[in-house]
């Protein structure tokens, strides 16, 4: 008697987020009816030259096509290094891996114009790894009228749902987003999300601005432990000015990125606040992230009893404390913890999600949640580049 699913097997997931500091990779075994089994993980950093090129491509400029193509090749090379490290540490050969799901590097996200661009040379990546590559997950959702983001809520529902309580999974990456998992879902090892009840959307800036400010003033890539923010004091007048942004008033479904929330946006908002000490601005940016996330949870998940955080912000205790305070100020009795409390380390969640999306592609099963993205319906996401 045949058991399992034809798509079962080992998958790799690669995720390079809006921090653009490197790529997180994971090797995981998926079997129908069972939770994901992580085999190994790896992180490969980006050289400053690549990071600078990626940041430059966030905004329109001269000779974009040439610069974009060269950056895509450089990205594929770093992604391949990450894959070879996963093979080595998991004791696998390329033939052991069913496929690798790769997000690519978002350089432009404009679903209102019908497109989103995640930079990557998937053909080169397949050539360098000799593994089937599944890429370009967001475009199909956008083609179906959706935002193309966030895409991880279906995975969140698969592994983090609860039969007893409404939960919110909050990703604090460059941009913050939430997934609302109403009570009654429950983890489902076979990977079928309760798409009729799952909701989620992008809230606003998180590490994109926090990191940019600390890098400008301390020449550090991120606010380690939130210590820079902890030295400062929130300026309520500046916070009000930052919150006066039309995106925060938009109804869901909605998504955003560095197209909007970047250093130029911040500098425009800081006009008239040049007297503030840098640490006070940092404290206020941290409060902005907490406030925008708490506002969206209060608006859409008032019965939430637990918020589980993943992404780089999960390593910032000052930000987590600010989020807990902001939730309480809005009358929510919701505990704040990281996804480690549910058995998945925060740094693994997004790379796991893209491995899972590759698994869903091979199963020819939907990967989006139309109630989250606003797409016309559920769609199989991704495009295959054979080994």
UniProtKB/Swiss-Prot annotation:
It comes from the Bacteria. Keywords: ATP-binding, Carbohydrate metabolism, Kinase, Nucleotide-binding, Transferase. This is Anhydro-N-acetylmuramic acid kinase. Belongs to the anhydro-N-acetylmuramic acid kinase family. Its EC number is 2.7.1.170. GO terms for molecular function: ATP binding; kinase activity; phosphotransferase activity, alcohol group as acceptor. The keyword Nucleotide-binding applies. Pathway: Amino-sugar metabolism; 1,6-anhydro-N-acetylmuramate degradation; Cell wall biogenesis; peptidoglycan recycling. ATP binds at residues 17-24. NCBIfam families: PRK09585.1-3, PRK09585.1-4. It catalyses: 1,6-anhydro-N-acetyl-beta-muramate + ATP + H2O = N-acetyl-D-muramate 6-phosphate + ADP + H(+). Catalyzes the specific phosphorylation of 1,6-anhydro-N-acetylmuramic acid (anhMurNAc) with the simultaneous cleavage of the 1,6-anhydro ring, generating MurNAc-6-P. Is required for the utilization of anhMurNAc either imported from the medium or derived from its own cell wall murein, and thus plays a role in cell wall recycling. PANTHER family: ANHYDRO-N-ACETYLMURAMIC ACID KINASE. GO terms for biological process: 1,6-anhydro-N-acetyl-beta-muramic acid catabolic process; amino sugar metabolic process; peptidoglycan turnover.
């Amino acid at each position: 008697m045949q058991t399992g699913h034809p798509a079962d097997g080992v998958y790799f997931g690669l995720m390079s987020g809006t921090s653009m500091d490197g790529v997180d990779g994971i090797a995981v075994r998926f079997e129908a009816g069972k939770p994901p089994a992580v085999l190994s993980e790896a992180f490969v950093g980006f050289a400053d030259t690549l990071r600078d090129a990626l940041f430059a491509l966030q905004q329109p400029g001269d000779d974009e096509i040439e610069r974009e193509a060269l950056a895509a090749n450089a990205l594929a090379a770093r992604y391949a290094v990450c894959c070879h490290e996963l093979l080595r540490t998991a004791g696998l050969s390329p033939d052991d891996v069913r496929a690798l799901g790769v997000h690519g590097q978002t350089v432009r996200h404009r679903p209102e114009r019908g497109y989103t661009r995640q930079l990557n040379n998937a053909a080169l990546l397949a050539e360098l790894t000799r593994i089937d590559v599944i890429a370009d997950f967001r475009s199909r959702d956008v083609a179906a009228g959706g935002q193309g983001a966030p895409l991880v809520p279906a995975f969140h529902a698969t592994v983090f749902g609860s039969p007893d309580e409404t939960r919110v999974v909050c990703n604090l990456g460059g941009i913050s987003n939430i997934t609302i998992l109403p009570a009654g879902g429950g983890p489902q090892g076979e990977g079928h999300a309760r798409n009729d009840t799952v909701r989620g959307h992008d809230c606003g800036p998180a590490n994109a601005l926090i990191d940019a400010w600390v890098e400008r003033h301390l020449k550090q890539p991120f606010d380690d432990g939130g210590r820079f923010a902890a030295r400062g004091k929130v300026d309520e007048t500046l916070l009000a000015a930052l919150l006066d942004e039309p995106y925060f008033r938009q109804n869901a479904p909605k998504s955003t990125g560095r197209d909007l929330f970047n250093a130029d946006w911040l500098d425009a908002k800081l006009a008239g606040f040049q007297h503030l000490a840098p640490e006070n601005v940092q404290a206020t940016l941290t409060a902005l992230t907490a406030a925008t996330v708490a506002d969206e949870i209060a608006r859409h998940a008032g019965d939430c009893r637990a918020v589980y955080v993943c992404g780089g912000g999960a390593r910032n205790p000052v930000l987590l404390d600010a989020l807990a305070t902001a939730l309480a100020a809005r009358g929510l009795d919701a505990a704040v913890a990281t996804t480690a409390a549910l058995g998945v380390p925060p740094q693994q969640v997004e790379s796991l999600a893209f491995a899972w999306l590759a698994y869903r592609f091979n199963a020819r099963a939907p990967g989006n949640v139309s109630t989250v993205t606003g797409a016309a319906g559920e769609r199989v996401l991704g495009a295959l580049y054979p080994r």
